């Protein structure tokens, strides 16, 4: 029997479509670029529109409304509390990929962000990982710095503590010199070196970078000083040109216009421009440092002679983060005032441990172009993400695929490659959901042109924002005030930027998709009509 493959699944947090070099970016990502050149780049790979829903789909192969993250735990509203599929953690209706692989003899290792439950019975250790070092909440200071919290602390900061767990042990302190990406790289390397060499492994490396707060080692930030002084629109045009040059988008693609709540670059004061450019410099440094840590893991596997027997998948968990956190009352009524009192967000300090910044909608749309909008939206900018596969046994070297794929395909694909059958509807005496995704084995081996055909229907819903897609046709519903509160229709083959609404000219196609939407709601348990968290 041939040797079973290893698996290395790497997830970036809020990475934009064109951030890395292999996808048109200017940020130094030599290790990811090398993986891409030796593998397959996916230009139509889709996730959920935010972090934890995507992670639940990645590790189960089914929709997040089934897996327990119908909405993010941080966003549970009274109408959703207690509803099936809205538990706020990975529930018992699903079996997790590491549980199945461990049962089949794989060593299951994790270092990184979990975001699928905070309690002991919800941690990575409880869901199949033999060894794990993880950040449990959805974000945290990357250096572990936290000012004293009191009743005035905004909800967003209380909900993102530096809460780490190793295996079953919750950590009270973090080591001197801690930085999230380095710590995750260190731990995964430790687990790989300590593993049983006779068994294959599944290694999961979900970084918490480049999610806010934007923080990175100063020496890397300095490498980007001045790089973004021309502003986000200049970067957007630069990246669009590079995407076309690389063949990642069509040469005549029409990019969706920028939609932003902030002023134009030229209308900002000098200090505002300087601080905004510095935030982008720090963001770039976070991406570069993440890439460096990926390189350490890949180099180790290469030296061990394991790399070519390892299926490597890299992806972002959603589109770039364009939210203006201060604009959401749910995050705390005095967020900026609290940050002013407890952090130093002066120009020269931005990016250090005691700073706390994000980069806003214009930089995000420089990264998601030509797509519409960004994270949290069910438009393409929120759900179409960069992804690449390196596995010499199957993927074509240096190839680019424009075929539709979804994060729900990952679990079926890895199980197929491992020769492990999903248990179906029952596992260990309890009823479970079957995967909704499809294996890529036939696609990657060249037997088929794509994993999905034009009849595949895929749905999305989060925060009241909806989408349903079949083939190249996609219907989108964005509630007021963030959208028109009516269904819009797009032909993505001709209009990937979702600019030309065909709802009036193609009423039959829209009606057909709305019927698919109703079936999707029925199958997955979406609760319709709840107040959207982001606009309450």
From Swiss-Prot:
Optimum temperature is 57 degrees Celsius. Incubation that exceeds 20 minutes above 50 degrees Celsius leads to enzyme inactivation. It comes from the Bacteria. PROSITE patterns: SULFATASE_1, SULFATASE_2. Its EC number is 3.1.6.1. GO terms for molecular function: arylsulfatase activity; metal ion binding; phosphoric diester hydrolase activity. Keywords: Calcium, Cytoplasm, Hydrolase, Metal-binding. Optimum pH is 8.9. Its main location: cytoplasm. It is found in: Cytoplasm. Monomer. One of its GO terms (cellular component) is cytoplasm. Its cofactor is Ca(2+). Ca(2+) binds at residues 13-14, 51, 317-318. Belongs to the sulfatase family. CDD domains: PAS_like. Changing residue 51 to S: Abolishes formation of 3-oxoalanine (also known as C-formylglycine, FGly). Strongly reduced enzyme activity. InterPro entries: Alkaline_phosphatase_core_sf (IPR017850), Sulfatase (IPR050738), Sulfatase_CS (IPR024607), Sulfatase_N (IPR000917). This is Arylsulfatase.
């Amino acid at each position: 029997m041939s040797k079973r493959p290893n698996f290395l699944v790497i997830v970036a947090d809020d990475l934009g479509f064109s951030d890395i070099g292999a996808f048109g970016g200017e940020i130094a990502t030599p290790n990811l670029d090398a993986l891409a050149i030796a593998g397959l780049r996916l230009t139509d790979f889709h996730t959920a529109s935010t972090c934890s829903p995507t992670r639940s789909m990645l590790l189960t192969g089914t929709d997040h409304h089934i897996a327990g993250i119908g909405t993010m735990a941080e966003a549970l509203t009274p109408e959703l509390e207690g509803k099936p599929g809205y538990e706020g953690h990975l529930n018992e209706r699903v079996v997790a990929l590491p549980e199945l692989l461990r049962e089949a003899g794989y060593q299951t290792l994790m270092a990184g962000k979990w975001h699928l439950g905070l309690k002991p019975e919800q941690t990575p250790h409880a869901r199949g990982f033999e060894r794990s070092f993880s950040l449990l909440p959805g974000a945290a200071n990357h250096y572990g710095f936290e000012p004293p919290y009191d009743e005035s602390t905004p909800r967003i900061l209380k909900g993102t503590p530096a809460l780490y767990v190793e295996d079953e042990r919750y950590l009270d302190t973090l080591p001197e010199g801690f930085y999230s990406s380095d710590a995750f790289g260190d731990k995964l390397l430790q687990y790989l070196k300590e593993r049983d060499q006779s068994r294959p492994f599944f290694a999961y490396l979900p970084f918490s970078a480049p999610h806010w707060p934007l923080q990175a080692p100063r020496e890397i930030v300095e490498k980007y000083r001045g790089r973004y002084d021309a502003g986000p629109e200049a970067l957007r045009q630069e990246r669009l040109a590079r995407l076309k040059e690389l063949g990642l988008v069509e040469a005549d693609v029409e990019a969706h216009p920028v939609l932003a709540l902030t002023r134009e670059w030229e209308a900002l004061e000098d200090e505002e421009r300087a601080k905004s450019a510095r935030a982008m410099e720090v963001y770039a440094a976070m991406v570069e440092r993440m890439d460096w840590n990926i390189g350490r893991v890949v180099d180790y596997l290469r030296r061990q002679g394991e790399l070519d027997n390892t299926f490597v998948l890299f992806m972002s968990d959603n589109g770039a983060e364009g939210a203006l956190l201060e604009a959401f009352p749910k995050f705390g009524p005095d967020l900026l005032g609290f940050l002013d009192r407890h952090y130093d967000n002066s120009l020269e300090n931005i990016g250090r441990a005691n700073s706390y910044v994000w980069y806003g909608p214009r930089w995000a749309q420089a990264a998601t172009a030509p797509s519409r909008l960004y994270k949290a939206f069910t438009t393409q900018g929120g759900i179409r993400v960069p992804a690449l596969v390196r596995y010499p046994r199957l993927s074509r070297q240096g190839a680019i695929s424009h075929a539709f794929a979804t994060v729900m395909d990952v679990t079926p694909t890895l199980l197929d490659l491992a020769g492990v059958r999903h248990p179906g509807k029952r596992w260990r005496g309890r009823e479970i959901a079957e995967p909704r995704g499809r294996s890529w084995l036939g696609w990657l081996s060249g037997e088929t042109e794509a994993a999905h055909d034009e009849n595949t229907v895929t749905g999305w819903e989060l925060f009241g924002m909806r989408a349903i897609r079949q083939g190249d046709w996609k219907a989108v519903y964005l509630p007021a005030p963030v959208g028109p509160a009516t269904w819009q229709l797009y032909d993505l083959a001709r209009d990937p930027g979702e600019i030309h609404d065909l709802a009036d000219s193609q009423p039959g196609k829209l009606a057909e998709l709305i019927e698919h939407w109703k079936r999707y709601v029925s199958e997955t348990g979406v609760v319709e009509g709840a107040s959207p968290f982001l606009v309450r």
